[in-house]
């Protein structure tokens, strides 16, 4: 089993470029974002004003207490009570605004995730087949699930904390200056130290956050791959090899994850230590000023609170930097996916062909193709197939049989030459219209989680129940379906393991029959079923192929003896063509293949 590709480097991402893309994306949500920012600012302002208001109560309490001790007055509890009620109202408003801001921001972040998932889902349908053949399923799924979730969670928390932290820093600075500029200067001395420490930690943690996200996709790919091929792994006793591969990827994920989390975790204790130093310095200087009557006791209490509040946003900004790193790492992978080159879905309007013109005539004219420029798979393929003919393509593994089908359906485009349908180049059809003309039965059957009725109806979504049942009967599938619990309403599980391989192929054939396409492609359709089921499939397909152009790709040469035309491929070229009898009589490469299979059966 091939291993998924592993990241080869831990170099730093384009952090600034990714943030610019995120900002451009957020510009589509200006109104809810602006509202969330406004309520965040209002909530923070009321919180900031709290210590200053409370200082008046503290000063009134201290003054009244001293006056009471001296016998010159008493504590004005009515005045203090009014202040506390006013303070309570401010904090209630702050909480209300914070709640509204949280509600808006949560909805906004989930809307962003929703839109990203929708864009990814639409993008998948526009990506060329080559993209998926070069990547594991787990890696693609990781971008849709892990990366989008990480992006949404980080977006929700980072924007809120960024706004409140900046607002708090500015507001607290203003309040501190209004109390004592000299004490403010002392408190500000901690800023350069704090910022320097944040920048150092961010610099070292940045590359590990990207490596963590990338390696997580690799681990997901391995888990998905091993789960899908679990039976193969156990049959070949490859558990040890698979475990070793997984451990290698898991170790790499562990290394990048613990380093990124450890470095980000250093910020809080470092910032707390620096903040406490400033707190102690302000407390000492403030007590000296109070003793000399420069400021009141209430102002000292408020200023100390502000110093504590001033260091908190710095700590929060350090956390925001970590969240931004995680968000940018996830966003970069999402944007990379969304920026992948797409297939051209629509043909040139000046030469667009009408899919109604497809009646089954297919011409390959000196087709040349390679998956990479330095590796040509098909060298010079030419052939004309008339409507209604059954064409068999045979040859050893790697001869280019399946590649011809991919070219016919424009999963890939030819490097030179052309493929035409009724004289129209396949590139003159819209891709969706072109593929609607083909019905496929693949060796790797695909059924989704749902009822048997729904799986067959996938061939034509507007088909009635009667039409679905008729298609199942034509595919010789009706009998076994009715013997299953629930019949046509039986629910298939995610990998359709509650029906046999032969039954899966009969269901896919029924789906193809229901689609009623003009051209059929049978790729190894009967290579993995028992003889009795193969006979049922062959009978159903013979009925289906009447009046339709059919391409049959098979290694069992006995299944295509009645083909109107047999194309024998070898190393990307057609070396022989003709009927079965003609090719046997010629005694060439086809005859050798046929006789070797016959000898294997006899042996």
Question: Where are the regions that the model predicts?
Answer:
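Juxtamembrane helix-loop junctions of ABC transporter transmembrane domains
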Residues: 7-15, 38-39, 46-62, 66, ...
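A short amphipathic helical element positioned immediately N-terminal to and/or at the very start
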Residues: 15-30, 140
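An intracellular "coupling" helix at the cytosolic face of ABC transporter transmembrane type-1 domains
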Residues: 28, 129-130, 148-155, 159, ...
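Transmembrane helices of ABC transporter permease
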Residues: 28, 32-45, 157-211, 282-295, ...
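Transmembrane helix-loop-helix hairpins at lipid-water interfaces of multipass membrane proteins
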Residues: 33-97, 178-182, 293-297
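Hydrophobic alpha-helical transmembrane bundles that constitute the permease/transmembrane domains
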Residues: 41-49, 91-99, 151-154, 158-170, ...
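Helix-loop-helix
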Residues: 64, 175-189, 259-333, 337-338
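ABC-type nucleotide-binding domain
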Residues: 346, 355-603
């Amino acid at each position: 089993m091939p291993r998924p590709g592993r990241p080869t480097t831990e170099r730093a991402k384009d952090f600034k470029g990714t943030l610019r893309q995120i900002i451009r994306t957020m510009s589509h949500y200006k109104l809810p974002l602006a509202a969330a920012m406004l309520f965040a600012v209002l909530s923070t302002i009321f919180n900031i004003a709290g210590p200053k208001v409370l200082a008046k109560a503290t000063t009134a309490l201290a003054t009244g207490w001293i006056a009471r001790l001296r016998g010159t007055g008493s504590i004005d509890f009515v005045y203090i009570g009014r202040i506390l009620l006013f303070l309570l109202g401010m904090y209630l408003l702050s909480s209300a605004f914070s709640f509204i801001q949280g509600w808006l921001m949560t909805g906004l972040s989930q809307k962003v995730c929703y839109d990203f998932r929708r864009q990814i889902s639409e993008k998948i349908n526009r990506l060329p087949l080559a993209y998926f053949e070069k990547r594991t399923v787990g890696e693609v799924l990781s971008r849709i699930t892990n990366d989008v979730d990480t992006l949404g969670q980080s977006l929700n928390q980072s924007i809120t904390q960024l706004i409140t932290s900046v607002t708090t820093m500015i507001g607290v600075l203003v309040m501190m200056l209004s109390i004592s500029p000299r004490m403010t200067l002392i408190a500000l001395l901690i800023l350069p130290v704090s910022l320097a420490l944040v920048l150092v930690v961010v610099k070292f943690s940045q590359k590990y956050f990207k490596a963590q996200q990338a390696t997580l996709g690799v681990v997901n790919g391995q888990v998905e791959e091993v789960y899908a091929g679990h039976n193969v792994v156990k049959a070949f006793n490859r558990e040890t090899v698979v475990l070793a591969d997984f451990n290698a990827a898991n170790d790499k994920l562990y290394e990048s994850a613990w380093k990124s989390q450890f470095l980000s975790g250093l910020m809080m204790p470092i910032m707390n230590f620096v903040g406490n130093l400033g707190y102690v310095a302000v407390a000492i200087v403030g007590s000296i000023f109070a003793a000399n009557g420069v400021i009141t006791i209430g102002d000292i209490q408020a200023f100390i609170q502000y110093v504590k509040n001033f260091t908190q946003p710095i700590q929060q900004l350090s956390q925001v930097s970590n969240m931004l790193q995680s968000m940018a790492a996830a966003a970069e992978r999402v944007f990379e996916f969304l920026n992948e080159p797409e297939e051209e879905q629509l043909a040139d309007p000046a030469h667009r062909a009408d899919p109604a013109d497809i009646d089954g005539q297919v011409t390959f004219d000196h087709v040349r193709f390679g998956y990479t420029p330095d590796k040509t798979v098909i060298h010079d393929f030419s052939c004309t197939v008339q409507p209604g003919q059954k064409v068999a393509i045979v040859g050893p593994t790697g001869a280019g049989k399946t590649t011809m089908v991919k070219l016919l359906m424009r999963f890939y485009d030819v490097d030179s030459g052309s493929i035409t349908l009724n004289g129209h180049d396949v590139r003159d059809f819209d891709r969706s219209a072109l593929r609607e003309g083909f019905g496929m039965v693949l060796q790797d059957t695909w059924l989704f989680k749902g009822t048997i009725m729904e799986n067959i109806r996938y061939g034509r979504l507007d088909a009635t129940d009667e039409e679905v049942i008729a298609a199942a009967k034509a595919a010789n599938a009706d009998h076994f379906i009715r013997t299953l619990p629930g019949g046509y309403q039986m629910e298939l599980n995610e990998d359709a393991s509650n029906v046999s391989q032969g039954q899966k192929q009969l269901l896919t054939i029924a789906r193809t029959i229901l689609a009623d396409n003009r051209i059929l492609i049978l790729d190894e359709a009967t290579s993995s079923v028992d003889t009795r089921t193969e006979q049922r499939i062959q009978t159903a397909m013979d009925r289906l192929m009447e009046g339709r152009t059919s391409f049959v790709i098979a290694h069992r040469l006995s299944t295509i003896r009645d083909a109107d035309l047999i194309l024998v491929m070898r190393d990307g070229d057609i070396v022989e063509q003709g009927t079965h009898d003609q090719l046997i009589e010629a005694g060439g490469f086809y005859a050798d293949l046929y006789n070797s299979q016959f000898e294997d059966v006899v042996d």
